[in-house]
Every structure is written in structure tokens, then in C-alpha cells.
Amino acid sequence: EFAVQLLAEGGAAASEAAIVGPSLVQSDLFGYSSHGVMRIPFYLQMLKDGDIVSQADLETIADSEAGLATDAHWGFGRVQCGRLLDELANRCKMYGSAIGTIRNCSHIGRLGEYCEIAANEYGLVTIAMVNTHGAARRVAPPGGIQSRLGTNPLAMGVPNGDEALILDFSTSATAEGKVRVKQIAGEQVPSGWLLDSDGEPTNDPNTLYDEPPGTILPMGGEQAYKGFGLSLMIDI
């Protein structure tokens, strides 16, 4: 209730706060603090700056029955993606499968949550992925020192009785939010997560937010081309 209250008093519509607040709390309870209530101050600032638009419409920009492309007009990501998911689930009933895209969307929260909803509420198998089209470049290519891609997560879900099977991971060594959690806590990050602006390995989370900024390594360690390749294809 406190999360909902903070969002509502910060400019979110009551109906939106009632969706976004519990989603953030659930992420914390599931162990994903990077996508939990620590996001509330950032959301409130984005509302203030106009980077999140309360009560934005979800516009259909292309429709081919089993395919749907939408524009979120910078509404709350959790709200707009939830609307898209509900519509795609209805189309799956009609056509057997469906695919959808959403653009101009604010932070969507934990990607795996949508796969959980699709599996547990609709009985659907899902594959979901996110890119930022250069808006939040954090990840350097193997051998590079400048960021070129976002952390571009990938998630899959399969119905399994009361508890769906969910796979949810960033294509980088870590999600940006996990670095932020360490920074807020005043802790070091594990080795293998970050490079500083000179391309040297570092355990200091502050380097990712310095000027010039450091970068997050791609997923895969010595086989980092695999994580970067996945990220590149998601971006495309």
C-alpha cells in the first residue's frame, strides 16, 4: 500500500499505481531487488520530468490479426505491457498464436513477470525480449571499452500447473539494476561484471555512472560473443 501511495502522490493515476506498486513489491519478494521498490524514486523523477506519461493510451500502429504493433506513448511500462499481453492472449485464443511489439515505452519492470502471467493466467508459452534502441547503452562488445548495446533481457515461460517454468536473464553479465543496488548499498560488485572507462576490470559500481562511464560486460565470460550476439539480435 505504501508503494501505491508514493506513486499516486507522485503523479501516477490511482489505477496505474495499483498495478505498478504491487509489481515492484513482488519483484523484491522474488529476490529481484534490481526491479523492486528501489525503482520508485526513479519513476517519480521520470513522472516529474515527463519521461513517464500518466494515463497514456496504447495505440495500435499495425494490425495483422495474429500480429500487433503498438505505441505506448511513454506510459508506465508495466501498465502498457500488461495491456498488450492481455490483447495478445485473446488473439492466441482466436488464431492459436500471436506476436506483438511495443515502442516508446518506459521501464517495464521485471520481464519474467509477463511470462508468469501468460503461463499462469492464460496457459500460454511465451518468449519475450526487450531492447532500448540505444537509449540506455551500457554494454561493450567483446574486446571493446565503449558501450554499444543495452542489457537487452530475454525471458521465456512455460505453464506447469500452479508454478510456471520461467527463464529470465539479461544478455549482459548482470542487469544494470543490480549494479545500482550495489551502489546504493555501498558494496562492491563481483568480478566479471564491469569495466571502467579505460577498459580495465573493476569491482566499483560507481564506475558505471561516472563521466566517462564504465561498461557492463556481455554475458558469457570468455565466450562473451554469445551474450553480445544475443543482445545484438534482440536490438535488431
Regions found by a protein language model. Name each.
Residues E1-G10:
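Generic N-terminal amphipathic, Lys/Arg-enriched alpha-helix
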Residues A12-G36, I52-D63:
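N-terminal glycine-rich anion-binding loops that anchor highly charged ligand groups
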Residues A14-S15, V79-G82, A224-S231:
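Short, conserved micro-motifs enriched in small and acidic residues
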Residues H35-A89:
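Active-site cofactor/substrate anionic-group-binding motifs, chiefly glycine-
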Residues L68-G161:
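A generic, well-ordered mixed alpha/beta core segment in the N-terminal half of proteins
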Residues A135-Y209:
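Phosphate/diphosphate-binding glycine-rich loops and adjacent basic-rich segments that engage nucleotide
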Residues P212-I236:
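Internal helical hairpin/lid segments
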